[in-house]
C-alpha cells in the first residue's frame, strides 16, 4: 500500500463561549480545525486525520493555508512516507512544513505547524489501526503504555451572571464526576472578590482538593 496526502483542509471558527480568565475573553477567540485527507482506506472508509489548536491561541488559518499546507502538497509524495512506504512519516512532513523557515519556535507559527502535526499523527495511527497512545508507545517506548494518567478539571472561569452558588455547583460537579483535583481561574477580578470566590469553593470541597 502506498499512502499519500490528497488534501489539507482548514477552517477557522469562533469558540463563541462567554467565559473568560484573567487574560482572555473566549467570546472573541477563534480556533483552527484541520483535516489531513489521505488516499488510504481503513475498514472501508477513507482515512482522515483531524487536529485543532488549543483554546487560548487564535486560529491560524492564514499561516496554514498560505505556507504550511502548500508545502506538504507540493512535496513529492514519496518524500513524506515512512521507510516501509506504507504509512506517512510525521517527521518528514514536519520537515517539509519547515522548509524555508528560520529555525526556532516563533510563536504563532508553532501553533499552525502543531495543529497540522496533530492531524498527521491522527491519520498515521488510523492507517496503522491502533490508538495513537499505543502507536507512540510501540515506537518510542516498550509498547506497554500506562493506561492511567493524571487529569484535573479546570474551571471557575468568569462569565456574566455567575454567582457564588453557581461557582460552587460547578466545582462540586467535577468532584461528583470523579475528579480528585480541580483548578479555578483567578486574576480576573479584584483580590477581595477572588478571595471570596476561593472561600465559596472551599466550602463545598474537601481539604486538599
Locations of the language-model features?
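Metal-dependent enolase-superfamily TIM-barrel catalytic cores that perform enediolate-based chemistry
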Residues: 141-209
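Broad gene-expression machinery/nucleic-acid interaction feature
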Residues: 31-33, 115, 148, 181
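Metal- or metallocofactor-binding catalytic centers and their adjacent structured scaffolds
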Residues: 41-127
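Structured beta-strand/loop patches that form or line metal/cofactor-binding pockets in enzymes
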Residues: 1-61, 67
Amino acid at each position: 500500500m502506498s499512502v499519500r496526502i490528497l488534501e489539507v483542509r482548514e477552517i477557522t471558527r469562533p469558540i463563541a463561549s462567554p467565559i473568560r480568565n484573567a487574560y482572555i475573553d473566549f467570546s472573541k477567540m477563534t480556533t483552527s480545525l484541520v483535516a489531513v485527507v489521505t488516499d488510504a482506506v481503513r475498514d472501508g472508509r477513507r482515512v482522515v486525520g483531524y487536529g485543532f489548536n488549543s483554546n487560548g491561541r487564535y486560529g491560524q488559518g492564514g499561516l496554514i493555508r498560505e505556507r504550511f499546507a502548500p508545502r506538504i502538497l507540493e512535496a513529492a509524495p514519496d518524500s513524506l512516507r515512512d521507510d516501509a512506504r506504507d504509512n506517512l512519516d510525521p517527521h518528514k512532513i514536519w520537515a517539509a512544513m519547515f522548509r524555508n523557515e528560520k529555525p526556532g519556535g516563533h510563536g504563532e507559527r508553532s501553533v499552525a505547524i502543531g495543529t497540522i502535526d496533530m492531524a498527521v499523527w491522527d491519520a498515521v495511527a488510523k492507517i496503522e489501526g491502533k490508538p495513537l497512545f499505543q502507536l507512540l508507545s510501540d515506537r518510542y517506548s516498550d509498547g506497554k503504555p500506562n493506561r492511567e494518567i493524571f487529569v484535573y478539571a479546570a474551571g471557575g472561569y468568569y462569565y456574566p451572571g455567575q454567582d457564588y452558588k453557581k461557582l460552587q455547583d460547578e466545582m462540586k460537579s467535577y468532584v461528583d464526576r470523579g475528579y480528585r483535583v480541580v483548578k479555578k481561574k483567578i486574576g480576573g477580578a479584584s483580590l477581595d472578590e477572588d478571595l471570596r470566590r476561593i472561600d465559596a469553593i472551599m466550602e463545598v470541597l474537601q481539604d486538599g482538593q
